[in-house]
């Protein structure tokens, strides 16, 4: 996010229950949990690529509590008749944002980092610190703090906290920000800041924990002005593409789970705030 002309506050208590700093129950080790959820995330990433869904994005600037600018776009993520992934914009009124400009990094963050995945392919890029155990709604979770080991020029990373379900070993919630945050007092037009965000996931088809809701409400400190930003991103209408499609991981076909019925609620998950 660029204006016209740090580590997030991880102590922020966003879990339902108190944080228990004790180690996992033996014989399970922290490293085993990390390897399990990284493998599950790779499986999840492959599976989500076989689903259609609707993505509803709102990016707002606020003056006090009054919205004074908004970018809003609704997109259906589909497959064409040849099975290629496509995005079809179904609603996109004229943006009224004036105090910030949406950059390509913002669009990339919305697409790739708000629904953050940390697979076994990316795990070596990050420092992963076990924090403890915490109840998240009806779920027992392991909590980890995540930060990139190094910042490679031109690359973007997630930095923050994740909650991993202690039964399925899948990430069920993330809280953090995209880094690096680019400040440039001499050339404000080159600044690129983004807000801290929370993404909640819910179980789809009785198997995979897919992102369903992201919210951010944060003040960005540009060189020339402080701008309060709000993001609201909804992911809805998940449907498995094609009855004959197969999802394979390490040579094995993954289970399809139970097919979700239209209007059926997800079968479990963390609870986003009331809208």
What is each stretch, according to the model?
Residues 1-8:
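Bacterial N-terminal signal peptides
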Residues 12-159, 166-173, 177-195, 203-206, ...:
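Structured extracytoplasmic
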